[in-house]
Regions:
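Short, contiguous pre-domain boundary segments
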Residues: 2-3, 7, 105-114
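Extreme N-terminal tail/first-helix region
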Residues: 1-19, 23
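A structural motif
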Residues: 93-107
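Short, contiguous alpha-helical
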Residues: 38-93, 128, 132-186
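A short, structured beta-strand-centered segment in the mid-to-C-terminal lobe
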Residues: 111-123
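Amphipathic alpha-helical coiled-coil segments
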Residues: 18-22, 123, 130
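Amphipathic alpha-helical coiled-coil segments and their boundaries
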Residues: 7, 11-14, 116, 161, ...
């Protein structure tokens, strides 16, 4: 994905990837029973359920700040045609998530030892809401609106809204590969 792109194109790309990734995750996790979701085939790795829980926790940390940002911001009909580019911090976060190298999850996003009941359907429902939120935000200026990362201290620079959407999709796609790998070992 180019680092400079019209916002409308970024929206289209992120939307397509989010939907495709959600469907891929659904196809993998829906056939799994509770024991399989909680099984740890990799001794030091997360179970499929913990990966799903991690994605739910991370999404939940962005939910209220995004709702508040959208509530206090104005729509801008010209925004989809304007160039979007990542902020410095947003580009760094997305870039690190795009690399295949294993990363430690920030403490604030770490799942507990046991995922919530119905974690698979919870994540799939959250992903439907994410696509709707992104669609609802299409007429806002993603480069101008700023949002904090819950993984960073409050004094850290804010990223732009497009970064938030991009990081969410890159993060989901990254973990879909982990889910696929772990589920294949069950």
């Amino acid at each position: 994905m180019s680092m400079r792109i019209p916002q409308g194109e970024l929206h289209t790309q992120l939307r397509a990837e989010a939907i495709e990734t959600r469907e891929r995750i659904a196809a993998i996790v829906r056939p799994l029973d509770l024991a399989q979701l909680n099984e740890h085939p990799e001794p030091n790795g997360w179970s499929v359920g913990q990966v799903l829980e991690h994605l739910c926790v991370a999404d939940g940390r962005y939910e209220d700040p995004l709702t508040a940002l959208m509530g206090r911001s104005r729509q801008d009909a010209g925004a989809p045609a304007r160039e979007w580019k990542p902020s410095f911090i947003g580009g760094m976060i997305a870039g690190s998530l795009l690399k295949p190298k294993p990363l430690k999850s920030p403490k604030v996003f770490r799942p507990g030892p046991t995922p919530r009941n119905g974690v698979a359907e919870e994540l799939l429902a959250r992903e439907l809401r994410f696509v709707k939120a992104m669609d609802d935000a299409a007429l806002y200026d993603w480069k101008a609106l700023r949002i904090s990362s819950p993984a960073l201290p409050s004094w850290a620079p804010k990223m732009n809204l497009g970064d938030g959407f991009r990081i969410h999709v890159v993060h989901l796609t990254r973990h879909s590969k982990q889910i696929e790998r772990v589920a294949a070992k069950l």
